[in-house]
Amino acid sequence: MMTALSDPRFTRAVSDDGSLATPFMKCLARLVRAHDSYGLWKDKCDAELLANFTVTEEQRRAIPVIGDPEPDVLLRLDLFYAAVGVVIEERSGLLISRTLEISDEGIGRVLFTTRRLVVLSKTLRDVHRFGFNTLGKCAKTGTKLVKDAIKSIETYPDVARA
């Protein structure tokens, strides 16, 4: 269960350190807003929307080591990696295909491809505990994944465009 943003113990996790201004976090906020089909979140700021991506150490300790991923955690995981894919597309100008496979135990893999090139491959473990200590850490992780994928595309441009 995620804690509300107004809880003073967890406001540290959504501190305004400029991380919300990164292209990755803006994209993630757009994707979260796209899931608001009833307009319930239209008055919320990006920090409030993205606060669910933070899991403090106290919350992480409360989650069992072994467990099945909850649907809301799977949605956040899907949105996070969808944002990675969209930002890679925006920066490279190439169509990116994302494959996300998760087992019932919370182990899986995410794979990003374009044409014949695998631009990013990541093994996922403990998916039921997915989250970041702060939004800054979320932005840093997402931006690093995008940079790694762009580096692969720049290293093998012929394969990426084949």
From Swiss-Prot:
Record has Ribosomal protein as a keyword: no
GO biological process, one term: nitrogen fixation
Entry annotated with the keyword Iron: no
Keywords: Nitrogen fixation, Plasmid
InterPro entries, alphabetized: NifX-assoc_nitrogen_fix (IPR004952)
Domain of life: Bacteria
Family, per entry: Belongs to the UPF0460 family.
Protein name, as recorded: UPF0460 protein y4xD
Organism: Sinorhizobium fredii (strain NBRC 101917 / NGR234)
